[in-house]
């Protein structure tokens, strides 16, 4: 089988290059554990973000944000706030990103061709790639030098709309040859949107990911080493 060659790779994070459990079992709980402190004693940056919710009552604000997290709502204001909170966890060694080893190697090997697109804020994405777990989680490595750029729902739009991928293709100057961009994700709706915008796609199947009803619609891989 002849492997296809691509100019660049657009990578999803959760369920693609990182276990889907990391977000719900590590990142979300860490955020919620610190939510009361954030609301009661916010930094200037956090206060600016909190004010965007337009909720003055602290209890009501807490309940609103808590519900967004528990229901995994892709709210752009929430994503901004989470990035600020997770920074403290990463920098204090409380959070380390469990990127799959095949993904670490792929990103390093294709360092001049890697882009990231996630619902999480660009700030949160950069933190995740700065503090990647290695050596059984005792140390971290920084993958940021291997990544050209990052996109999120604030900069590019939601991941299930083709217009978002159209915008990304224009940003990375591949509007004329979009089939040379390979988008990897575990979410068929995202793949459909990317495909509609002219990008090539691969469905990534990882342990713990939600079952895909028709996984024959897209070419699937179980490791980035297959590319």
Swiss-Prot record:
<comment type="pathway">
    <text>Amino-acid biosynthesis; L-methionine biosynthesis via salvage pathway; L-methionine from S-methyl-5-thio-alpha-D-ribose 1-phosphate: step 3/6.</text>
</comment>
<feature type="binding site">
    <location>
        <begin position="118"/>
        <end position="119"/>
    </location>
    <ligand>
        <name>substrate</name>
    </ligand>
</feature>
<comment type="function">
    <text>Bifunctional enzyme that catalyzes the enolization of 2,3-diketo-5-methylthiopentyl-1-phosphate (DK-MTP-1-P) into the intermediate 2-hydroxy-3-keto-5-methylthiopentenyl-1-phosphate (HK-MTPenyl-1-P), which is then dephosphorylated to form the acireductone 1,2-dihydroxy-3-keto-5-methylthiopentene (DHK-MTPene).</text>
</comment>
<keyword id="KW-0028">Amino-acid biosynthesis</keyword>
<keyword id="KW-0963">Cytoplasm</keyword>
<dbReference type="GO" id="GO:0043874">
    <property type="term" value="F:acireductone synthase activity"/>
</dbReference>
<comment type="subunit">
    <text>Monomer.</text>
</comment>
<comment type="pathway">
    <text>Amino-acid biosynthesis; L-methionine biosynthesis via salvage pathway; L-methionine from S-methyl-5-thio-alpha-D-ribose 1-phosphate: step 4/6.</text>
</comment>
<comment type="similarity">
    <text>Belongs to the HAD-like hydrolase superfamily. MasA/MtnC family.</text>
</comment>
<dbReference type="GO" id="GO:0000287">
    <property type="term" value="F:magnesium ion binding"/>
</dbReference>
<keyword id="KW-0378">Hydrolase</keyword>
<dbReference type="GO" id="GO:0005737">
    <property type="term" value="C:cytoplasm"/>
</dbReference>
<feature type="binding site">
    <location>
        <position position="12"/>
    </location>
    <ligand>
        <name>Mg(2+)</name>
    </ligand>
</feature>
<dbReference type="InterPro" id="IPR023214">
    <property type="entry name" value="HAD_sf"/>
</dbReference>
<keyword id="KW-0539">Nucleus</keyword>
<feature type="binding site">
    <location>
        <position position="159"/>
    </location>
    <ligand>
        <name>substrate</name>
    </ligand>
</feature>
<dbReference type="GO" id="GO:0019509">
    <property type="term" value="P:L-methionine salvage from methylthioadenosine"/>
</dbReference>
<dbReference type="InterPro" id="IPR023943">
    <property type="entry name" value="Enolase-ppase_E1"/>
</dbReference>
<dbReference type="GO" id="GO:0005634">
    <property type="term" value="C:nucleus"/>
</dbReference>
<protein>
    <recommendedName>
        <fullName>Enolase-phosphatase E1</fullName>
        <ecNumber>3.1.3.77</ecNumber>
    </recommendedName>
</protein>
<keyword id="KW-0460">Magnesium</keyword>
<keyword id="KW-0486">Methionine biosynthesis</keyword>
<dbReference type="InterPro" id="IPR027511">
    <property type="entry name" value="ENOPH1_eukaryotes"/>
</dbReference>
<feature type="binding site">
    <location>
        <position position="186"/>
    </location>
    <ligand>
        <name>Mg(2+)</name>
    </ligand>
</feature>
<dbReference type="InterPro" id="IPR036412">
    <property type="entry name" value="HAD-like_sf"/>
</dbReference>
<feature type="binding site">
    <location>
        <position position="14"/>
    </location>
    <ligand>
        <name>Mg(2+)</name>
    </ligand>
</feature>
<keyword id="KW-0479">Metal-binding</keyword>
């Amino acid at each position: 089988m002849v492997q296809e060659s691509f100019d660049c790779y657009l990578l999803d994070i959760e369920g693609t290059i990182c276990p889907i459990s990391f977000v719900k079992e590590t990142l979300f709980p860490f955020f919620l554990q610190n939510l009361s402190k954030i609301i009661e004693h916010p930094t200037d940056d956090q206060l600016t973000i909190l004010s965007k919710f337009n909720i003055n009552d602290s209890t009501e604000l807490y309940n609103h944000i808590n519900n967004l997290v528990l229901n995994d709502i892709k709210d752009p204001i929430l994503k901004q706030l989470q990035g600020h909170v997770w920074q403290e966890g990463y920098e204090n060694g409380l959070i380390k990103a469990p990127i799959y080893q095949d993904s670490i190697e792929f990103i390093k090997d294709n360092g001049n061709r890697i882009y990231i697109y996630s619902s999480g804020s660009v700030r949160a994405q950069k933190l995740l790639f700065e503090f990647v777990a290695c050596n059984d989680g005792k140390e971290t490595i920084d993958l940021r030098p291997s990544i050209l750029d990052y996109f999120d729902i604030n900069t590019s739009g939601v991941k299930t709309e083709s217009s978002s991928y159209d915008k990304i293709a224009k940003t990375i100057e591949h509007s004329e040859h979009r089939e040379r961009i390979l988008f990897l994700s575990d979410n068929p709706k995202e793949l459909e949107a990317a495909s509609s915008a002219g990008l090539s796609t691969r469905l990534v199947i990882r342990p713990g990911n939600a079952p895909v009803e028709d996984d024959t619609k897209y070419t699937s891989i179980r490791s980035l080493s297959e590319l």
